[in-house]
Amino acid sequence: MKRCGAKPYKGKEKNIFVSYCHKDKKYVFPIIEQMAKDGYRIWYDEGIDPGSEWPEIIATHLNSCDSCIAFISENSLNSHNCRREVNFALLKKKRFFSVVLEEVQMSLGMEMQLSATQSIFKYTYSSDKEFFTKLYEAKFLQECLGDPNPDIIVSKPSDYTENLKDLFGSDDLVRKPFSDKWFLE
């Protein structure tokens, strides 16, 4: 499985916390890569060391970040962790906005939370250039801008598509009764 080409930011300077659902990484990672390439200091959960206490690390980074971008999709709206990250960022009064990846039906509570700030509806832009131009208009993101990193290679969403046959040697992945696990048969 391909990893994001941008390393999570480590340091004390102002940075952007990215909230996203792992199921959406093929859409989110290319955006993170482009932003990092353009010099933005971004932290996302690939920066959690194995064996670490996940909620503490997330809360610490959300608390210390300057800004938060939440990537909104059906997947993220159905993720308890993504909703908690959004709620915590707003509770801590972080500079916040959302990037809506697809048309979604939000619960009234989430709609109320996200309506306080302007969202960017990525799926409405005809090109990545147009999208990034709009994204970078967010003035507070400029405070999280460091030196560009031209060595980062920006992926395409298809680079992150998982092929079951490549991963497991079979396309036959089934769910067993009374189990939330997936098994090969």
List PLM regions with ranges:
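Hydrophobic acceptor-binding patch used for acceptor engagement in glycosyltransferases
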Residues: C68-I69
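C-terminal interaction surface of TIR/SEFIR-family domains
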Residues: M1-K37, L101-E185
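Conserved BB-loop
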Residues: P30-T60, E74-R83, I120-Y125
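Hydrophobic anchor at the start of a short beta-strand
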Residues: I42, F96-F97
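Short glycine-/small-residue-rich Rossmann-like dinucleotide-binding loops
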Residues: H22, S73-E74
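Conserved TIR/SEFIR loop-to-helix hotspot centered on a Trp-containing motif
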Residues: E74-K94, V104-L108
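An anion/phosphate-binding loop that grips the pyrophosphate of nucleotide cofactors and donors
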Residues: C65
